Amino acid sequence: MPTEIERQHLASQPRFNSYGPRELCGFGPVAAAARTSSQIAIHKPDRVLLIGIAGTFNASVLPVGGAALLPRVIMHGIGVGTDETFVPAGEMGFQHWRGEGEESAIGDEIVLSTPRSSISGSLLTCSAASASTQDMRHRLDRYPEVVAEDMEG
């Protein structure tokens, strides 16, 4: 969970405290990656879930207040340019991590290991959330398959 707000909300849900550690990962992609990495090293879990708040891009597929298990995360904002001039790193031929030994390369998109997906579509992770319909349109033009955006994916 990114923040204490999400943890407090979820703590009131049935069976929330029934499964393993429930750690905070922090706010934003960098903090979430660093904190998640340190917690995985400590707890050595078989599975990790990111549970938090995301903004929906399609309320008919993912209603406000709904929950979803998504099969993919796409990173937006790593590349060149902004808005309609933005070009993702992958389109320029760059990986975020080239991979090493048994480790897979990491690009603009990560396919998640999920038992099943509750809806089709991807989660878009951004350093700054959409502030307007225009922001959302720019992102949907580039990533038409996304149904929601967060800042920790």
Residue ranges and their predicted role:
Residues 1-44, 61:
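N-terminal short beta-loop-beta anion/metal-coordinating cradle
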Residues 58-144, 148:
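Mid-sequence, gly/pro-rich, charge-dense loop/helix-turn segments that line enzyme active sites
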Residues 25-26, 51, 70, 127, ...:
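Short His-Asn-centered micro-motif
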Residues 47-49:
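Structural motif
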Residues 33, 150-153:
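Conserved glycosyltransferase catalytic-site signature
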Residues 19-25, 142-149:
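Short pre-catalytic strand/loop immediately N-terminal to key active-site residues, enriched for Gly-Thr
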